[in-house]
Amino acid sequence: MTKRAEAKYKIDRRMGQNIWGRPKSPVNRREYGPGQHGQRRKGKLSDFGTQLKAKQKLKGYYGNISEKQFRKYYAEAIRLRGDSGDNLIGLLERRLDAVIYRAKFVPTVFAARQFVNHGHVKVNGKRVNIASYLVKVGDVIEVKESSREILIVLEAKQLAERDVPDYYEVDHNKMTAKITRIPLPADVPYPVLMEPNLVIEFYSR
């Protein structure tokens, strides 16, 4: 197993949940966290502990976003009009690596980040190599023609584990995607329960 895969599955084990719904997740075989103390019985979490876990799970799901960057999403979420939890999910789903993952151009969100960073993606005809780039409604996201035969892309085309959400328009022949609206948390096909309002509460303490 690669170091990247090990880190990914360590997140699953720490959360005690298969947060991406992957068949090879270690929590499909055991229900304790990583490390020598992982098998200890866990007591009931405090409010702080519950909020912290919700934050770690959401950060982990989107590729273990850095704390500094995640806090910026919180600040923007509370600045925008409407429900802050809804706003937080909307921002995360607009990340370019999240769009590439949702469109099924690559098999994992970790692969999506690397794919974007390596310059394989265009937005409105221009190359963008920043995974955290926020896509707008109507933007056209495209896999570069020279990158469409990369093995990881070919493998992703065979995926049957997840469907493309209805807030995207995706053409897998042309390898293009477009976000048609900003999703609400209930629209996002998370394999496990995400609680963005607990994340907002965590940072609002």
UniProtKB/Swiss-Prot annotation:
Residues 94-157 form the S4 RNA-binding domain. One of its GO terms (molecular function) is rRNA binding. Keywords: Ribonucleoprotein, Ribosomal protein, RNA-binding, rRNA-binding. PROSITE patterns: RIBOSOMAL_S4, S4. Residues 18-46 are annotated as: Disordered. Signal peptide: none annotated. Disulfide bonds: none annotated. One of its GO terms (cellular component) is small ribosomal subunit. GO terms for biological process: ribosomal small subunit biogenesis; translation. InterPro entries: Ribosomal_uS4, Ribosomal_uS4_bac-type, Ribosomal_uS4_CS, Ribosomal_uS4_N, S4_RNA-bd, S4_RNA-bd_sf. PANTHER family: 30S 40S RIBOSOMAL PROTEIN, SMALL RIBOSOMAL SUBUNIT PROTEIN US4M. HAMAP family: Ribosomal_uS4_B (MF_01306_B). One of the primary rRNA binding proteins, it binds directly to 16S rRNA where it nucleates assembly of the body of the 30S subunit. With S5 and S12 plays an important role in translational accuracy. Belongs to the universal ribosomal protein uS4 family. This is Small ribosomal subunit protein uS4. It comes from Methylocella silvestris (strain DSM 15510 / CIP 108128 / LMG 27833 / NCIMB 13906 / BL2).
